[in-house]
Amino acid sequence: ISAIDKDKNVRIVAENLSNSTGVTYYDGDLYFSEVNSIWKIQNIDEVLLSSKQIPEKVLVTDNLPSDTWHGWKWIDFGPDNKLYVPVGAPCNICNPSLEEKYNFDKRYASIMRLNDGEWEYVARGVRNTVGFDWHPKTNNLYFGDNGRDWMGDDMPSCELNVVMNDDSFYGYPYKHSMDVLDPDYSKKIPDNVDEFIDPILELGAHVAPTGLSFYDGDHFPAKYKNTLFMTLHGSWNRSRKVGYKIKAVHFDENGELLYHKDFITGWLQKNKGQ
């Protein structure tokens, strides 16, 4: 991980990391992730503005699941000042909490929050989210979810979801998108699962939503206030490629979805995703 100091020099902040993807800033400290760990460097602004030696990283946690399939940890602090961490399913389709090969670990396929040193569930049944953000007015958490593969070109759809209540269940591995039952797992729904939370928007199969960010600035026209910008990485498991664009999802100040449209396109050329 690198940073630019006050003299515009690029400085290495941390190195020799394993799949470090999540980076966020909170209360003067820089936080970053590895697959099974989260670290921080304290007083990073003071260090970079004074050209002091960068201190050693401090361990926040090292007990997260270590599978690399959907194992990258995209991290951020919420409006409640708590650290949010998604844990993707270590497979295309499976039920890790019931399978010995995954140590019956219930943390897979979830979004968790670190609250005073203890982990708690924000959302479960989430296959693989690599982008989330909070509505600037309601503070509700919105997240994308990448749908499973090998069910054909057009199903199931990737999703945009909202968390209205903590520990809600969003369907994986039993149900996908609005009403697509999984051919392998829909007949194995346990008795304690009595509700699936539907997505607020189906994005299309295999488009792979990644980065999400609400806009609350003053530079764009007023119609973009409270708009969620989403990057769609694009497909691989499809005969004709889709995605490869940025979508704008417009909400009102109460968090109600108004409409959505493409914001930037043009990366998909000659149907090759190049």
Residue ranges and their predicted role:
Residues 8-11, 46-48, 55-58, 108, ...:
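Predominantly a core beta-strand signature of beta-propeller blades
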Residues 17-21, 63-68, 126-130, 267-270:
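Short coil/turn segments at the loop-to-beta-strand junctions that recur within blades
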